Regions:
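Basic, glycine/lysine-rich polyanion-binding surfaces/domains
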Residues: 1-232
Length: 232
């Protein structure tokens, strides 16, 4: 991939799980490995979702989006994960929805700043930073070359692509995944569910585990591995 090019990526192999409601914050805090409080309108987070034995069911990129949280994960596990999360809702005032209607997302790599996309304000400059402009939510991802995730209403995304990205080179999801690998960002697919504890795929190194937060599903195993160096 030439770093001097601007590239747009097809991300159809990703899915979005939307979590919203009065108790959404508390609910997610009891399910994921990271502190959901860090996810704000200007900062996104990575997090794992474990089974009671501390094995990863999913790896999320979580974005605070309006009054909800968007959990981005592999499409191969999204339906199953939506069902599992819904099982934990019980009496909480929370709604869990897979691929909410009307929301669109796409990726871009800005290799040529001279032909950069036109926005009302500046692009996010540090990894995981979020900017909200031109009716879109824009997240900066890890990597030396600016790599961005765009989320918004479908019509806004399509208009933005037509206006700004018509000259971008189109690349597949495999190319997007390669950028994640180069940046040390893992993925969990259907074939790798329940195969790893979070530390085995470096979630601690990339800041996707908070060892000071309260309990969550699988937390005992994750903490024991951290403090004692091995799972039991």
């Amino acid at each position: 991939m030439q770093p001097t090019k601007n590239i747009i990526f097809d991300l159809k192999k990703l899915s979005i799980i939307k979590v919203e409601g009065e108790d959404a914050h508390t609910f997610l805090q009891g399910q994921i490995t990271n502190d959901i409080s860090i996810a704000t309108p200007t900062q996104s987070i990575h997090a794992g979702f474990c089974n009671p034995k501390g094995r990863l069911l999913a790896f999320f990129h979580i974005i605070k989006y309006l009054d909800s949280y968007l959990l981005i994960c592999s499409a191969s596990i999204a339906e199953n994960i939506t069902k599992k999360l819904s099982m934990y809702v019980l009496r909480s005032k929370v709604k869990v929805e897979l691929n909410p209607k009307g929301i669109m997302y796409f990726g871009a790599l800005i290799g040529n700043q001279d032909e950069c996309i036109s926005l009302e304000g500046k692009l996010p400059t540090t990894p995981m930073e979020v900017a909200n402009q031109s009716s879109l939510t824009i997240i900066r991802l890890h990597g030396d070359i600016p790599r961005l995730l765009f989320i918004g209403e479908k019509n806004d995304c399509l208009n933005f692509i037509e206006k700004n990205c018509s000259q971008f080179e189109e690349k597949s999801f495999n190319d997007w995944s390669l950028q994640n690998i180069k940046s040390g960002i893992p993925s969990i697919y259907n074939e790798t569910q329940e195969q790893f504890i979070p530390q085995s795929i470096n979630l601690d190194i990339i800041g996707a585990i908070n060892f000071k937060k309260g309990c969550y599903t699988g937390q005992e195993i994750v903490a024991r591995t951290h403090y004692l160096g091995k799972p039991k």
